[in-house]
UniProtKB/Swiss-Prot annotation:
One MF annotation (Gene Ontology) recorded for this entry: structural constituent of ribosome
Gene: rpsM
Keywords of this entry: Ribonucleoprotein, Ribosomal protein, RNA-binding, rRNA-binding, tRNA-binding
Domain of life: Bacteria
GO cellular component, one term: cytosol
InterPro entries: Rbsml_uS13_C, Ribosomal_uS13, Ribosomal_uS13-like_H2TH, Ribosomal_uS13_bac-type, Ribosomal_uS13_CS
Organism this protein belongs to: Thermoanaerobacter pseudethanolicus (strain ATCC 33223 / 39E) (Clostridium thermohydrosulfuricum)
Protein name (database record): Small ribosomal subunit protein uS13
Lineage: Bacteria, Bacillati, Bacillota, Clostridia, Thermoanaerobacterales
Family: Belongs to the universal ribosomal protein uS13 family.
Entry annotated with the keyword Endoplasmic reticulum: no
């Protein structure tokens, strides 16, 4: 099993797909990396040579922010928004949608399960 950026890539998948298991790498970035490394995207991970794996590892380490570093950067960006108290930061703090979606109905993913309020008795 090839290990790149601290992630074990699945052996039976194509390299193009297997690279997407790394946080911060999607299909287009995966193809970009494979082109730079000169590796055929249709190759299975188990068929990669040690040299190809080391080339992929080197390219990813040098040129891309992935896994822990990327997660940390995203978390710091959100924390910065919350600290400066801007609108987006406040929405993050309150656990509400940040990008202008309606909240009168829907928005259940961000708000979590319903908290039912009892009706007033007469």
């Amino acid at each position: 099993m090839a290990r790149i950026a601290g992630v074990d890539l699945p052996r039976d998948k194509r390299v193009e797909i297997a690279l997407t298991y790394i946080y911060g790498i999607g299909r287009s970035r995966s193809n970009e990396i494979l082109a730079k490394a000169g590796v055929n995207p249709d190759t299975r991970v188990k068929d990669l040579t040690e040299e190809e794996v080391s080339r992929l590892r080197e390219i990813i380490d040098k040129e891309y922010k992935v896994e822990g570093d990327l997660r940390k950067e995203v978390a710091m960006n959100i924390k910065r928004l919350m600290d400066i108290g801007c609108y987006r930061g406040i929405r993050h703090k309150r656990g509400l949608p940040v990008r202008g979606q309606r909240t009168r109905t829907n928005a259940r993913t961000r708000k979590g399960p319903r908290k039912t309020v009892a009706k007033k008795k007469k």
